[in-house]
Amino acid sequence: RGIPLPHMETDFLQLRGKTILVTGVANRRSIAWSVAKVLEEAGARLVFLFRSPELRDKNLALLGKGNAETCVCDVEDEAQVAGLAPWAAENSLVFDGILHSIAFANYSEGVRPFHEVKKRDFLQAMDISCFSLAALCNALKANLAENASIVTLSISSTKMAAESYGYMGPVKAALDSSVVFLAKSLTSQVSPHIRVNAVGASPLKTSASAGIPG
């Protein structure tokens, strides 16, 4: 018979008391919201970033009785992104992690063959879905913990032409490449202990995926 061990509460994720910036919550079906619930259950302090006051207000009930910490920032607006640093400093925020779950593509006219994609649509998708990761990291570099973990949500099919996903495939491929370049630049210029990773999810039923034709 083994020697009985005293009960020990495990903290597998080791997130208790950590401050995490969560982006990309659109509604309860968002991947970002599912991740946020796990983070909260693990004891993390969550700060939610929304694109607009209207989107924030729409989700306040979901976040819990209006007590959630939130900020508004449209990542297409350079002035708003630049304003994140003084906002974080004013609120004494040091982020142990960032969840980047921001993506957009204009499929209002359906999925076109890739060679027919409109330049403005492609560049907008690249700005929102890819460049925003670098922009957020740069804006908040002084507000990151020395061992901060930055995670972005990608897809599992950037190496194949999934036609129903349209031009977001190349955009997500650019996001994957940005991850390794960000890891290199942040560890050399900000802190050698910062980590940057991408999670390539398989197809999931979300409000975002509902907008993908086919």
Task: Locate predicted features.
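Conserved hydrophobic beta-strands of the Rossmann-like cofactor-binding core
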Residues: T19-T23, F95-A103
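Rossmann-fold cofactor-recognition segment
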Residues: L63-A79
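Canonical Rossmann dinucleotide-binding motif of NAD(H)/NADP(H)-dependent dehydrogenases/reductases
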Residues: F12-V47
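Structural signature of beta-strand start/N-cap positions in the alpha/beta core
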Residues: T19, R45, V94, S149, ...
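Conserved Rossmann-fold cofactor-binding substructure of NAD(P)-dependent oxidoreductases
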Residues: E76-N91
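A short C-terminal helix-loop "cap" of Rossmann-like NAD(P)-dependent dehydrogenase/epimerase domains
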Residues: K65, I212-G214
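Conserved glycine-rich Rossmann-like NAD(P)H-binding loop of the short-chain dehydrogenase/reductase
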Residues: A42-K58
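Catalytic loop of short-chain dehydrogenase/reductase
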Residues: G24-W33, A103-A142, E146-P192, G200-T206
